[in-house]
């Protein structure tokens, strides 16, 4: 009985640990950083800290922890944005594999040299104070075919150009995107939450997901890959105890 109770407890702890969100820490700079490193400009405005990913059924939830949360409606640097509304939230790009150029912090990685993003979650209003709805698109062709870059939003200032910011919804790019499912996004204090229905896609967190996100200036970009870890040591210990118990009963 004591062994059975111990095994149950260990398995419970193991499953609880694996149910925790998968975390991508921001170790990505990307090009072009113009010599600034991880963050161009004020870290108190643009720093991106980490992404946390979890999935229940077909719904992928991505939490982006960033100093930019809650600032898209502030009209930051509006004089340097083409529409005069300031810097907004970028769309979330996803792929089944991550193929950055070079090694960390990937200073030469950009829209040409890096990962070709397979999916994009397009926000309905990237300047909204609270959040809204979004649409998941399957993307084809190159990043230049399917995405808008920071330079499509900014001009006349130093920013991280060469980074994917948004799904290109223009008529010219129509052949490079296919609408799939929907989702929502919300602004929650120190982070943004994207809840995306993966129905119709080939994505699953169980198989690993790469992501790319940043504000529309690209002043800090987070990019990386999350996959389910190997069974934890507690789980392996529990399985070992189960095996030992079975062996004893057979003697």
Residue ranges and their predicted role:
Residues 20-227:
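Surface-exposed extracytoplasmic segments
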Residues 229-248:
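A short, hydrophobic C-terminal helix/tail in secreted or cell-surface proteins
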Residues 4-13, 237-240:
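Sec-dependent N-terminal signal peptides
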Residues 15-19:
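Sec/Tat signal peptide C-region and signal peptidase I cleavage site
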């Amino acid at each position: 009985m004591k062994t059975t109770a111990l095994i149950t407890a260990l398995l419970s702890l193991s499953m609880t640990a694996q149910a925790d969100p998968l975390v991508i820490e921001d170790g990505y700079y990307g090009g072009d950083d113009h010599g600034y490193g991880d963050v161009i400009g004020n870290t108190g405005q643009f720093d991106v800290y980490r992404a946390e990913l979890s999935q229940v059924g077909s719904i992928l939830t991505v939490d982006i922890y960033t100093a930019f949360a809650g600032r898209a409606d502030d009209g930051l640097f509006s004089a340097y944005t083409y529409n005069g509304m300031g810097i907004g939230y970028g769309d979330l790009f996803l792929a089944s594999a991550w193929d950055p150029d070079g090694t960390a912090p990937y200073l030469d990685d950009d829209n040409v040299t890096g990962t070709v993003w397979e999916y994009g979650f397009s926000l309905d209003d990237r300047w909204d104070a609270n959040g809204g709805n979004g649409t998941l698109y399957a993307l084809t062709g190159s990043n230049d075919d399917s995405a808008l870059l920071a330079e499509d939003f900014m001009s006349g200032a130093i920013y991280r150009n060469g980074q994917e910011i948004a799904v290109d919804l223009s008529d010219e790019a129509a052949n490079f995107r296919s609408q799939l499912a929907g989702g929502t996004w919300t602004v929650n204090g120190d982070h943004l939450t994207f809840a995306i229905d993966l129905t119709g896609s080939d994505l699953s967190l169980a198989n690993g997901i790469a992501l790319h996100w940043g504000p529309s200036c690209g002043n800090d970009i987070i990019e990386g890959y999350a996959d389910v870890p190997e069974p934890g040591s507690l789980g392996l210990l529990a399985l070992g105890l189960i095996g030992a118990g079975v062996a004893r009963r057979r003697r």
